[in-house]
Curated annotation (Swiss-Prot):
Gene behind this protein: gatA
Family the entry assigns: Belongs to the amidase family. GatA subfamily.
Protein's name according to its UniProt entry: Glutamyl-tRNA(Gln) amidotransferase subunit A
Gene Ontology cellular-component annotations: glutamyl-tRNA(Gln) amidotransferase complex
Enzyme Commission number(s): 6.3.5.7
A GO term, aspect molecular function: glutaminyl-tRNA synthase (glutamine-hydrolyzing) activity
One BP term from GO: translation
């Protein structure tokens, strides 16, 4: 099941041209995004030019699988000649002079960039309410959040503005929005995709990810954007077809680890969806094995010490001098720094910078940052030990369905939205979220996590699951082809 392959067949048969397809999506965005607010920058002229180029390639019979396929990018991936804002006033007018590796790889495959997507500012948030350009609405219920920080990426695909979008995942920022919007999304192993040209939040956690309706499309796209990059020393790359190599194989004999203590406290409807999903996996031949995952509250605390520290260091570059917003009223250098950063950053970003600077202070370093790094290593070892007994670990993707805007303005309650997704980021492991059911008529997602660079097992298992149990009920009518 693949939207990409359906579109490929239509393009290759001449039923529709890349330009016509692009115009359809652009028209839909212009007509409907006023209600959702998922797109920051619409790249109409650039998209039509790329579509014309794609049509020429198709006419010459030299097309690949992705030639002419439209895509939307989270607005923290640099795009040459197109502004990249990270949803911040600080970068409102920043136009990158180069492409990120992720966007370049998409262009090299002949994809058509429709625009840049809304997000939580500098990817800091779980609701997409922390954006200089306004909150994003969930297409399933416009009064609710789409999740974050890649809320625009999830909302756009759920609304049918593109078949595919890119996102980034630092603590669950593709998986939690996928759960809220009824999508499939994956954070690959740390180091499998390049971070070059991706606006940094927390460099040892950040990783590019993909949103789609179907797991097969996620796998196809991850193969397209993954690989070694000379500009990112942490990117080790993966072999060709790493994510798609096992999609046709059945999952009989695969062992799924489940920590029952993580299920018993879930809301009843989500608990029922989880148990039904595990039963479906058993029907496909998988074995369920009881395991004990590390304490999730400790993982949450570890994450919210280390990531603000890394963010404080990364965001120090935005000083009003080199690039970014500059306060026009500053009278001296100190005032320029202070006013530019005070005005240029939103409240949530400033909160995390302050936390980061506090835990990095010499008087607090050993008590907070150093201990958190030690705990990160212990947790990673504990999780990897589980993988000596099982192939994957199953967890919910979120403790709830999408909640209403304004319900979690208290930062601590918002941070708890990431409690099931953070372990994969702490340990650098791959994890995929996929729709498993409904709670209060809203989609909810499950999550599989695997050993580092065993990404192919995750895509295999979810592709086979969706092949047998389908996901059509999770696709909004407006998003259907």
């Amino acid at each position: 099941m693949s939207y990409i392959k359906k579109l490929r067949a239509r393009l290759d048969s001449g039923e529709i041209s890349a330009v016509e397809l692009t115009k359809e999506y652009l028209a839909k965005i212009k007509e409907q995004d006023k209600r959702i607010n998922s797109v920051i920058t619409l790249c109409e002229a650039e998209a039509l030019k790329e579509a014309e180029d794609a049509d020429a390639i198709i006419s010459a019979g030299k097309q690949g699988l992705l030639t002419g396929i439209p895509i939307l990018h989270k607005d923290l991936f640099c795009t040459k000649g197109i502004r990249t804002t990270a949803a911040s006033k600080m970068l409102d007018n920043f136009v990158a002079p180069y492409d990120s590796t992720v966007t370049k790889n998409c262009k090299d495959q002949g994809m058509v960039t429709l625009g840049k997507l809304n997000m939580d500012e500098f990817a800091m948030g779980s609701t997409n309410e922390h954006s200089y350009y306004g909150a994003v609405s969930n297409p399933w219920d416009l009064e609710r959040v789409p999740g974050g920080s890649s809320g625009g990426s999830a909302a756009a695909v759920a609304a049918g503005f593109a078949p595919i979008s890119t996102g980034s995942d630092t603590g669950g920022s593709v998986r939690q929005p996928a759960s809220f919007c009824g999508l499939t999304a994956m954070k690959p192993s740390y180091g499998s995709t390049s971070r070059f040209g991706m606006v940094a939040f927390a460099s040892s956690f950040d990783q590019a990810g993909i949103f789609a309706h179907y797991a097969e499309d996620v796998a196809i796209m991850l193969d397209a954007i993954a690989g070694e990059c000379e500009f990112d020393s942490t990117c080790v790359g993966v072999k060709e077809n790493h994510f798609t190599q096992d999609l046709e194989k059945d999952i009989s004999g695969k062992v799924i680890g489940v920590d029952e203590s993580l299920i018993k406290d879930l809301p009843e409807q989500i608990q029922e969806a989880v148990l039904k999903t595990l039963d479906n996996f058993k029907k496909l031949g998988a074995e369920i094995k009881s395991v004990k995952v590390p304490d999730l509250k400790e993982a949450l605390s570890t994450y919210y010490i280390i990531t603000p520290a890394e963010a404080a260091a990364n965001l120090a570059r935005y000083d009003g001098i080199r690039y970014g917003y500059r306060n026009p009223e500053a009278r001296d250098l100190d005032e320029l720094y202070r006013k530019s950063r005070t005005d240029g950053f939103g409240a949530e970003v400033k909160r995390r910078i302050m936390i980061g600077n506090y835990v990095l202070a010499s008087s607090q370093y050993d008590s907070y940052y150093n201990k958190a790094q030690q705990l990160r290593k212990v947790m990673t070892d504990q999780i990897n030990q589980i993988f000596t007994q099982v192939d994957v670990i199953f967890m919910p993707a979120s403790p709830s369905e999408a909640f209403k805007k304004g319900d979690k303005l208290d930062p601590v309650s918002a941070y708890l939205s990431d409690i099931y997704t953070i372990p994969a980021n702490i340990s650098g492991l791959p994890a995929i979220a996929f729709p498993i059911g409904f709670a209060n008529n809203l989609p909810v997602g499950g999550q599989l996590m695997a050993k580092a660079f065993n990404d192919n097992i995750l895509t295999q298992m979810v592709v086979q699951y969706q092949k047998h149990y389908g996901i059509e009920e999770f696709i909004l009518e407006q998003a259907r082809i």
